[in-house]
């Protein structure tokens, strides 16, 4: 799918355009609740359950989107969509919007293909009903059925008015992954349309040079019917315009009836047909390139095998002519069938329910007939391939043994004259299988006579009116698989036998070489013996010498002589002998190489034939598996319809039961109420009188209890008062004792305070005396400082300090004796 936001916007706009919704978005966040509700109602044709028509808030929009998601998950897809929520959609979460757009895109794609298939199947069943009443020959009916059945998986058309029923979801995929894989339309339409133009040009060129019809005849009903009636070639008649081929329109055609238009109805404008339908058929499913020297019969379905036969023998040429005629008849009937399919959706009204059931059974019968015919054709092609291989083996092994020639001749006879692949080996008959084994064509037989053709046509007519179940298809698939396995085992055994013979011849040659060398060796001389003893490798103690026979030797085709010289280094061989032996070895190598090349050529041819048989077996297995899956899907569809009907009947029965139970309950309730209203009996009066007496007794009892409680309360009150008085006396005594103790404490405290005051006064007096003494000393010092003697003493001390400094600085200078500094 698309990765960028612009591509997702394009996908959303394409969805809105296809569903005729007049909305366009410019960014991914524009996909709100209204867009998804409109897509739901347009694609599915139903209203959203539990829808709030006029949303007044963001919660209402989230509720509407969640209703759309829940309806898709529960009613249609039947898978969990818990990763997508309505709240995220309303908030503009890009991941949730992309997931929901992808689901709607895949759902629209799947519905388109489903409705196209149902319309084609309905037209095929209509044609079958008309043909069974004798309106057309039987051979034309068979080819027309085959062509319509083969084109169903590839053709698409617009919706028909009765195509979308209430039970469409019973044939849908089982998971979101399958629904998503059905989509990818917006991204792949451009790729399909680009590759389609080239294929149309190719077919137009091929129609002018060969007799093969282009696929426009299969898509063009008018031209096909004209060719069937008058028989001109493709070059004589010109194709009508493309718009006549209504079945070729795919998703480009607007969806009309399945999508209700809630606004006022506007008739859709005629739109140019989308080139996807026809060109996609031409490019993907009808194109076959012819090889030089070969003739290929074109087929419609890619699962069919192209019939190829070389123009080298007379009987092969006759077979090619028969194949060409049959392919032309088949193509003409296919063209007529496409006309009937294109007209069917507009001619016939919707069928009632019983008619639809009958048509489903007729479709199953027609499909079983077509499957048996295709299996017989593939059986004939396998016989042709195996017969050619047996003939090639018989011509390629001229120099082989006689038993091989007899085996190849016997195999060729079996491949030419047997009726099926199952006659190559012993087998047990299977029930219900032998009547379908003969093929309508033979490749290696002589030209068929008119009697054989008449018998063959009678058998085909009988087979057309006989119903076959799915068990027959299982038996046929198993039988063909066993035949292929038996043939492959036979080829592998033959290949292994040939390889074993080559190995035995090589071993015998090596043995002869060894014997010749053993006989031709001379005795060793004394010198050689001494040399060999000296050059012999010393063995470890306790060990043994290894013999040359202990390990197997590997000898290549070029290394025999060199290996012998390495094994016998002490042996003397002359140069001429060595040269001669080398030449013999080279000649032997050349001879072995030529034989190996011849063997490789035959082996390669056999391998190519085996690969071709395997390829055809794979194609056949894929075809049978496809038919089995298709029948299984049809059976599952019928089972789902049956289960849905059973479920609906059970729901209806449960509703009836609930209604009956409700009605019975209402009747019982009314009767019981009437009965209770009428009950005025003696028992009721006795009960009432007893109740009144009980009330009087209860009242008297309550009075007695009240008096007794009053007496008790007065007695308790007296006791309580006495207790209070005693407690009051006790606490008075305690308080008096406490007052005495407090008074004694006060007196002691006062005495202590008086003693403390006296001590404090004494300390104050001592401090005052001390301070007065110190002040007097200070005053005396101050008076001394005012004297001159004090200052002189200070100056003498200062001068003395200076003299000490001067004696320290000038102590080195010489002074005359008798002088002091």
UniProtKB/Swiss-Prot annotation:
Phosphoserine modification, residue list: 445, 447, 449
Record key words, sorted: Coiled coil, Cytoplasm, Cytoskeleton, Phosphoprotein
Q: Which GO terms describe its cellular component?
A: centrosome; cytoplasm; spindle pole
The residue ranges flagged as biased composition, category Basic residues, are 427-441
Keyword Cytoplasm listed: yes
What residue spans carry the Basic and acidic residues bias annotation?
Answer: 325-340, 390-410
Question: Sorted alphabetically, which Pfam families does this protein's record hold?
Answer: DUF5745
Q: Where is this region: Disordered?
A: 310-354, 390-474, 514-550
Q: What is its main location?
A: cytoplasm
User: What name appears for this protein in its UniProt entry?
Assistant: Centrosomal protein of 95 kDa
Protein species of origin = Rattus norvegicus (Rat)
Q: What is this protein's gene name?
A: Cep95
